[in-house]
Regions:
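Mg2+-dependent prenyl diphosphate-binding active-site environment of isoprenoid biosynthetic enzymes
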Residues: 14, 18, 24, 28-215
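Long, acidic, intrinsically disordered low-complexity segments
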Residues: 1-21
Length: 215
């Protein structure tokens, strides 16, 4: 008999496999080569899929109807959006490697990486819209809010590099937007699509912020 821990690992492994399947098979087009080649390279970069799995868990926490297959498209959308942030972050940091592979800006160039990141945003929205459950509009609103705040966080990060001192409060605000917000949003979007009540969303938001801060 499997232990509870083993069952949990197997379940999370299944979620990751399903998310991977959607993400790695997302781009069918081959031309323009300079757009789809690097973008496919990003989508095939792997990862733990933490944000995608959190969306599924957020859905499961509030829904008593089991897993709706459409939630995997929302999970994939969050992972693709996360990839966008990494691609653009690598441009801003002049990074040469990520996840044991060259970054797009290193393998190609910064302009190509910029364009690939832009495409990933579009693909993320496209994937989320495939999760056309009754609360999809509210999920899209939350998704967009998270994207804006992630960009704000990245901007604060660059601004703080030019400051002599940064307060703890300022730093915590920056990391909440840059890193924590998408973690929080992953739980919220899953829960929203599962028809969460306001008090459930409030609790998950608080929990998501704590996870995000830990990152």
């Amino acid at each position: 008999m499997e232990t509870k821990e083993k069952q949990k690992d197997t379940k999370f492994g299944y979620y990751k496999k399903e998310i991977d399947k959607i993400i790695t098979g997302y781009i069918k087009k081959k031309e323009p080569v300079l757009l789809y080649g690097p973008s496919r390279f990003a989508l095939e970069s792997g990862g733990k899929r933490i944000r995608g799995i959190l969306a599924i868990l957020g859905y499961k926490i509030v829904s008593n109807k089991g897993i709706n297959r459409k939630i995997f498209f929302a999970s994939s959308a969050l992972e693709i959006l996360h990839l966008f942030t990494l691609v653009h972050d690598d441009i801003m940091d002049n990074a040469d490697s990520r996840r044991g592979r060259p970054t797009i800006r290193k393998k190609w160039d910064s302009n190509t990486a910029l364009l690939s990141g832009d495409l990933l945003v579009g693909l993320a929205y496209e994937s989320l819209m495939k999760a056309d459950l009754p609360q999809i509009k509210n999920a899209l609103i939350e998704f967009n809010k998270a994207l804006i705040e992630v960009c704000e966080g990245q901007a604060y990060d660059k601004e703080f590099e030019e400051k002599d001192t940064v307060s703890i409060k300022e730093y915590e605000m920056m990391i909440q937007k840059k890193t924590g917000r998408l973690i929080e949003s992953s739980l919220l979007i899953g829960a929203i699509l599962g028809n969460a009540k306001p008090k459930e969303l409030k609790a998950l938001s608080r929990y998501g912020k704590m996870i995000g801060r830990a990152f």
